[in-house]
Regions:
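Short, well-formed alpha-helical segments that are part of the catalytic scaffolds
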Residues: 10-24
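A conserved acidic beta->alpha catalytic loop
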Residues: 20, 37-46, 67, 94-97
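Short beta-strand/loop segment that forms part of the nucleotide-sugar
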Residues: 30-39, 63-65
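Glycine-rich, basic loop-to-helix element that forms the pyrophosphate-binding segment
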Residues: 64-82
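Short aromatic/hydrophobic "clamp" motif used to bind/position activated sugar donors
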Residues: 87
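Conserved donor NDP-sugar-binding/catalytic core segment of glycosyltransferases
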Residues: 95-132
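A short, conserved alpha-helix in the catalytic core of glycosyltransferases
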Residues: 104, 146-148, 152-157, 162-190, ...
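Active-site-adjacent helix/loop segment of glycosyltransferases
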Residues: 183-265
Length: 266
């Protein structure tokens, strides 16, 4: 199984992430790791290079970018280095359990060909998810932890290169389902994801970029009324910006204009 992990100033998470993958390897021996670094300025690359047990993995690649080209682009690059039938994408601020990949492999083996991707369960704060309690089928998956059939990932040309960060997973999920494949949520395939310090926490960068890219997706997949609602949401956020989003007005305005002119004739 190919595992792609994107890093950017991620020195805080490297050892914990790698140590957990090493433990999981005991039950799923053929793990190939592809780290794509988006031009970190800290010790991320040095820590990856110096990891003393990297030879215990079937493959351990570090791909360094000369500039940060975004989360989706970096994942696409990492996936291009592998060849396995299943590609797994993990955020660097995650830890897998010893049986994570073993359970994933069992579920994949039991899945029909119409299942194109499998989303992991995130702990301690579960990713908001609506899914069929019997089949596990869901409408979209989080890019923080999921696996996909390589042939499908390649067919869809991976993540959209125009989406720098946030909502690239929603876009990919939509295109996957539009190609007549399904996404299965797997509650028994668990990871720890340290994205938030507390439940309900707001990350300004995530909120702002999600807002901008939400509008992009409304242009791409929605109706005229969907787009108008998106602009209305933009206006509300822009004029009522306060609290953790204070200081983001210029970014929001830039995203508004950029999305309008880029996708006006999409």
């Amino acid at each position: 199984m190919d595992i792609v992990i994107v890093t950017y100033n991620s020195e805080k998470w490297i050892k914990r992430c790698l140590d957990s993958l090493l433990k999981a390897k005991a039950l799923s021996s053929d793990l190939k790791l592809f780290f794509v670094d988006n031009h970190s300025s800290d010790q991320t690359v040095e820590l990856l290079t110096a990891y003393e047990k990297k030879d215990d993995f079937s493959r351990f690649e570090i791909i360094q970018q000369e500039q940060n080209q975004g989360f989706g682009n970096a994942n696409n690059l990492g996936a291009s280095f592998g060849k396995d039938e299943i590609v797994c994408f993990l955020n660097v601020d995650t830890e897998v359990f010893e049986d994570t990949f073993k359970r994933l492999e069992e579920i994949i083996a039991e899945s029909s060909k119409e299942i194109g991707a499998w989303e992991f369960r995130q702990l301690p704060y579960e990713h908001p998810k609506i899914y069929d309690p019997v089949t596990g089928i869901t409408s979209w998956m989080s890019g923080a932890a999921f696996a996909v059939r390589r042939e499908i990932f390649d067919k869809l040309q991976g993540f959209d290169k125009n989406i720098f960060m946030y909502a690239e997973d929603v876009d990919f999920s939509w295109r996957l389902r539009a190609s007549d494949y399904k996404i299965k949520y797997c509650p028994t395939v668990k990871i720890m994801h340290y994205s938030y310090e507390s439940i309900g926490a707001v990350k300004p960068a995530q909120y702002v970029n999600s807002l901008i890219n939400n509008l992009l997706l409304r242009y791409r997949f929605g109706s005229f009324s969907d787009v108008m609602r998106g602009y209305f949401q933009f206006a509300i956020v822009f004029f009522l910006t306060s609290g953790p989003l204070s200081g983001s007005e210029k970014t929001i305005a830039s995203g508004f204009c950029g999305t309008f002119f880029t996708y006006l004739f999409f």
